[in-house]
Design a protein with these regions (language model features):
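Short, glycine-/small- and polar/acidic-enriched structural segments
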Residues: 1-151, 157-172
């Protein structure tokens, strides 16, 4: 018999698998690897299979999207060409840096594909998303934007409140 038990976030899910409260779980593909090598939490976890179909997306606040459209008129069409790059975001990031601030972006977990995809998207436009070091497991070293863990159910409300200006998430 299997009982499905919802967890509030990825960290709690991982902790509950490690401490034995859960016998197994659908988790982020990077979590078993990260735990096994001791990134954050040290535990030997084996994964049976991966279900990721690369369905993640990046969302930005309407105010940021309006600024991106000003920077690239091609985005102001009914159906802008996809994929949409972060090139039009770069001047916005620079303006915030000039004001002593950083653009705030959310992702679901440090070892999630969402984090890596968001970092790649930003870096491909010359926006430094930060890097990991032995003393910085948050990946904020030399960052031009601030990436933070935001639980998926909280992302829309956190965006609406202005605590983040964008995020990367996918459907489970």
């Amino acid at each position: 018999q299997v009982e499905v038990v919802a967890q509030p976030n990825w960290k709690t899910l991982l902790d509950n698998v490690i401490n034995g409260d859960l016998d197994g779980a659908h988790m982020l593909s990077g979590q078993p690897i990260a735990a096994t090598i001791g990134f954050g939490t040290k535990a030997h976890i084996i994964t049976a299979f991966t279900m990721d179909l690369n369905g993640n997306g990046i969302t930005v606040a309407n105010s940021i999207w309006d600024q991106m459209k000003e920077n690239d008129p091609e985005l102001d069409k009914d159906k802008p060409k996809h994929p949409i790059t972060a090139d039009s975001l770069k001047p916005i990031v620079q303006e915030k840096l000039d004001e002593g601030e950083k653009l705030q972006m959310g992702m679901v977990f440090p070892v999630s594909t969402h984090n890596y995809e968001l970092r790649y998207w930003l870096a491909s436009a010359g926006i430094h998303p930060g890097m990991y070091t032995k003393t910085d497991i948050g990946g904020r070293t030399d960052a031009e934007v601030e990436l933070s863990v935001t639980p998926p159910p909280m992302m829309p409300a956190t965006l609406e409140a202005g605590n983040i200006q964008g995020y990367c998430v996918g459907e489970p």
